[in-house]
Regions:
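Short, Lys/Arg-enriched anionic-surface-contact patches
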Residues: 86-107
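Mobile genetic element proteins and their domesticated derivatives, centered on retroelements
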Residues: 32, 43-46, 82, 109, ...
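RNase H-like nuclease fold core
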Residues: 135-186
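Short, basic interhelical loop/turn and adjoining N-cap
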Residues: 120-136
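Short helix/loop capping segments that flank catalytic or ligand/cofactor-binding pockets
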Residues: 41-43, 91-92, 121, 167, ...
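An acidic- and aromatic-residue-enriched active-site/binding cleft used to recognize and process polar
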Residues: 37, 127-128, 162, 177
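Short, conserved DNA-binding cores of transcription-related domains
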Residues: 1-90
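Short, amphipathic alpha-helical "recognition" segments used to contact nucleic acids or chromatin
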Residues: 32, 102-117
Length: 186
């Protein structure tokens, strides 16, 4: 019953299902263990499936809180054999490669950051470290730059020098005046 509830709540697709849910009352955390459904993956892959090499150790991703408890998704990621015999890790549908946070957590962190306009306050509200929020900002910025139309990115560019508290430390601020947007990747 409990696993069905989380299956519907997380909506991870048919290739992944909830194995079990553990609650640690001492540290107020919920771990949702997710299992890879190999048979479903085989059906979907057809001729491109060449076997599972092994499974990585459990990885843990921070997810949106459930009530007042921190929530984490834990899963063993399968390493598959490619057609050419090389081994690769399967991408998970809830997070980017190498990320320790789910897409939903990152999106919520950005929403909170836009509301607070303060990284420290955002990290306090989400009960995570300042570095976590900083990493999420940089990852979101990089994804945004990749989605931009490259043909309009450099048609017109303004550059401004800003000093910090009159102590002669300057920051160069590139801006796209036509769109009113700052561009940190010039």
């Amino acid at each position: 019953m409990q696993e069905n509830f989380f299956d519907k709540l997380l909506d991870l697709g048919k290739e992944w299902s909830i194995e079990r849910v553990e609650f640690d009352e001492q540290i107020n955390e919920i771990d949702i263990y997710v299992r890879f459904n190999l048979d479903t993956y085989k059906e979907k892959s057809g001729d491109t499936y060449h076997g599972v090499y092994d499974y990585r150790e459990y990885r843990r991703w921070r997810h949106l809180d459930i009530l007042q408890y921190k929530c984490f998704i834990k899963a063993k990621i399968p390493r598959l054999i490619a057609q050419d015999g090389k081994i690769y890790s399967l991408d998970v549908p809830w997070a980017d490669l190498g990320s320790r946070h789910t897409f939903l957590f990152e999106r919520f962190a950005i929403d909170v950051l836009l509301a607070t306009k303060n990284q420290t306050k955002t990290s306090q509200l989400l009960r995570c470290g300042f570095n976590v929020i900083n990493h999420i900002i940089h990852a979101a910025s990089e994804r945004g730059v990749l989605r931009r139309d490259k043909s309009i990115l450099y048609k017109q560019l303004s550059v401004d020098e800003k000093s910090h508290k009159a102590n002669h430390q300057y920051v160069t601020v590139p801006k796209l005046p036509r769109y009113g947007k700052y561009n940190r990747y010039c």
